Amino acid sequence: MSVLLETSLGDIVIDLHTELAPRSCTNFLKLCSKHYYKLNAFFRVEKDFLAQTGDPSNTGKGGASIWSQLPSTSQDSSTSTYFTPESSDGQLKHLKKGTVSFACFRKHVQGADEDGEGGSCELLAGSQFFVTLKDELDYLDGRHAPFGMVVEGHEPGGTLDKINHAFTDDQKRPLRDIRIRHVVVLEDPFADPDGFCAPSRSPSPTPCQVRALRLADDEDVHSDVDPASKEEMRRNADTNAAALTLEMVGDLPFAEIRPPENILFVCKLNPVTRSDDLELIFSRFGKILSCEVIKDKKTGDSLQYAFIEFDKKDDAERAYFKMQNVLVDDRRIWVDFSQSVSRLHGDWVKKRNAGSDAPRAHYQSGADEQSVDSYRPNAGGYQKRGDDRRHDRRDQPTARGDTSSWHSRQDSERSYRESNDDTRDRSNKRSRRHHDDVPQQSRSRSERHDSHRDHERHHLSRHVRPSDEGESKCRYEAHSHTRHDEHTRRHDSSSTAARRDEDRRSERSRHDRDRDRDRDRDRDREREHRRRTEDRRRHDDRQRSRDGSRR
């Protein structure tokens, strides 16, 4: 008791309530078997309300039941275009998104007023039906006849959501046609009415349907645009989408962020060129707020590129045009505008945290913790407070699209360095404690030995004869030297064992990190292989279903 509707926006599978609404389900199933709904358009789509179709004329005024289309010789034929659907007595309601109902109208019986009071009224329906696009539409109960529920296509981002977000005109009709391309009856438990004959093939579009065509779902709206403009539009759309994604994940303060226009990037410098020299050369173009040649943190060697921040945008532009390919310290330098927004992001994070510390990576790169700069664009350009300190910009991404991958790479490298630093600090502390404890123990032992030696010397001076005093003194000194040599050997052996243990722990931690890295790499490869296999399988299934529908 299921029907598959293949629409231009995706597939919809409907389960029918054959026990609660047998007459409505019979009408719907036989119309589907007759391909009555093929190429019907959703002529009425109201956001978060309903999507209506089932009228071959696509006007909302046509459509007929299956019994009115039977031959006149049939026992089940009816002269009326409409039929009376069942009343479910409150068992079927419009409570969930995806409820399928026949669009009904009231027929007033004699003695009833316009509101249906003072007499009796009955609901009549033809072929038009609608699908609800929201939960809890209980005010439709008693006015229309539910007979099914969407079981596939109602998930978030599915076909119903695509229909719900379609652009419509003033008459609530989608600007781009949403049509039922094909109908497949998966299961039909009802017998065919007398005189019913299903067509042998899918019928061709009627002239009425052709005249009602608007903008086809596969028609290119930019067909009159030249390829260059179309490519530019595509690139702009991709750039805006990527920037919006970075803003949502927190990598950018806002999607429209732009690099500062008063900062120049200078590269191909001589390793001997210093920040003061570069500032002196560029200062003839205007006031310089900061000039820094980026250096390696460990060795202190120049990385041969620098950032120069001018007070005004015009000064930076003049320096850009005048200093391009100029010889500085026997090197032809290259000047360009800075494309980095990392400092802007760090300042934004600091403001968002309402005075709390900015991310550690931001301060490690040289940013000032006491000042907050404003780089949002306004009529006068980017503004900045007087701060001459610039942070380290090496390995910064030059393209906006690489910001997310660069941040993830920097985070992994930073965590690796911090783990090594913590291990090194712990080992240094242990070695310092060991070296500090050993002299203290030696001093305490030497003090005890000195007191014991003085006591023995005093005892010998009192009880030993003068002739034996020299021999006893030599014997005591030899014993003291022997104990001192033994203590020295013990100290050396303990220090060697401590160093050996520390080297063994460092080697074990390095092997653990290598093993974890290899395991993560194998897991990523396996996940990528599974994803590709699943994509290939879905593509093959889609191709087979498309070939089957063509046949």
UniProtKB/Swiss-Prot annotation:
Role: PPIases accelerate the folding of proteins. It catalyzes the cis-trans isomerization of proline imidic peptide bonds in oligopeptides.
Gene name linked to the record: CYP6
Ranges in coiled-coil conformation: none
Origin organism lineage: Eukaryota, Fungi, Dikarya, Basidiomycota, Ustilaginomycotina
Polar residues compositional bias, start-end: 66-88
Name of protein: Peptidyl-prolyl cis-trans isomerase-like 4
Biased composition (Basic residues): 455-464
Protein origin, superkingdom: Eukaryota
Residue ranges, compositional bias (Basic and acidic residues): 384-397, 408-454, 465-551
GO-annotated molecular function: peptidyl-prolyl cis-trans isomerase activity; RNA binding
Residue ranges of domain RRM in the record: 262-340
Protein family according to the UniProt entry: Belongs to the cyclophilin-type PPIase family. PPIL4 subfamily.
Enzyme Commission number(s): 5.2.1.8
Reaction equation(s) it catalyzes: [protein]-peptidylproline (omega=180) = [protein]-peptidylproline (omega=0)
Keywords (A to Z) from UniProt: Isomerase, Nucleus, RNA-binding, Rotamase
Record's subcellular location: Nucleus
Domain PPIase cyclophilin-type: 1-185
The keyword Phosphoprotein is annotated on this UniProt entry: no
